[in-house]
Amino acid sequence: MIDITLPLTDIHRHLDGNIRAQTILDLGRQFNIALPAQTLETLIPHVQVTSTEPDLVSFLTKLDWGVKVLASLDACRRVAFENIEDAARNGLHYVELRFSPGYMAMAHQLPIAGVVEAVIDGVRDGCNTFGVEARLIGIMSRTFGEAACLQELDALLAHREKITALDLAGDELGFPGSLFLSHFNRARDAGWHITVHAGEAAGPESIWQAIRELGAERIGHGVKAVEDRALMDFLAQQRIGIESCLTSNIQTSTVASLADHPLKTFLEHGVLASLNTDDPAVQGVDIIHEYHVAAPAAGLSREQIRQAQINGLEIAFLSDDEKRALREKVAAA
């Protein structure tokens, strides 16, 4: 179902949600960190979703083992490099990797700005090695509160030229976007793009708030947008992208089944929705699965899947010249 004549993108992909089980095992042994299992086979159920989780917060606990083994900046650098290697193996031409430096630093009190630098270094080295194009999106983990998010923002701003956009992720219900207005004002002043996780656990009002008050140009997940016809019209007319993550939304119980997922409705309404993975290692999926298995199960036609692939580049945080160059590069391959 993937059109090989077009760039393949993944623009909603958490770097800290894509830490290989083998890497968790390796780093756990290297730093003498107690893990819930000592073999790859027995570790996987602890670090990967093997059935549907009851809610988003339960799903997020599966990510914790990955960051618990990040006991050094070199470990962060390794994980970043491996993210690009994984993207190359999946056939991705362009990826936007988002990461929460405070979350990655938390278990071992690493310097947050140092984590940002390590991720930048690892991604750069990976891109040079594997030929994938990548951009970095900094995440503020709302679950840890306004002050912690301010620390993350300061660390990201220390490397502002290497960061493309700012995101807000975590407990959407407990920590609404209205708490973070000043944070996003600073991000926009820095010239960054804005994307926000919204309409995943909360309703359409969360999406409206992200757009109107935080300046969101894209929305992560946004499944609840279908509950508000005026919002759907606004998204289409203003070309505000939706970063859809099919399998993830089932695993978090955000959507009951793939057949119920609103991606098809988004595309029919003219909303610029794209196909993405979210947390590939935790979910046990890759972008190929999303195109070949999840999208057809969600009722998308071949042409709609192709449109979602086109949308991925259309709403990417790249200049028109960069998009054109990527299209030409893929067409010539």
Curated annotation (Swiss-Prot):
Catalyzes the hydrolytic deamination of adenosine and 2-deoxyadenosine. The keyword Transmembrane helix does not apply. GO terms for cellular component: cytosol. It catalyses: adenosine + H2O + H(+) = inosine + NH4(+); 2'-deoxyadenosine + H2O + H(+) = 2'-deoxyinosine + NH4(+). Its EC number is 3.5.4.4. It comes from Salmonella schwarzengrund (strain CVM19633). GO terms for biological process: adenosine catabolic process; hypoxanthine salvage; inosine biosynthetic process; nucleotide metabolic process; purine ribonucleoside monophosphate biosynthetic process. Its cofactor is Zn(2+). GO terms for molecular function: 2'-deoxyadenosine deaminase activity; adenosine deaminase activity; zinc ion binding. Keywords: Hydrolase, Metal-binding, Nucleotide metabolism, Zinc. The active site is at 200 (proton donor). This is Adenosine deaminase. It comes from the Bacteria. Substrate binds at residues 14, 16, 170, 279. The record marks 221 as: Important for catalytic activity. Binds 1 zinc ion per subunit. Zn(2+) binds at residues 12, 14, 197, 278. Belongs to the metallo-dependent hydrolases superfamily. Adenosine and AMP deaminases family. Adenosine deaminase subfamily. It is an enzyme of class 3 (hydrolase). The keyword Acyltransferase does not apply.
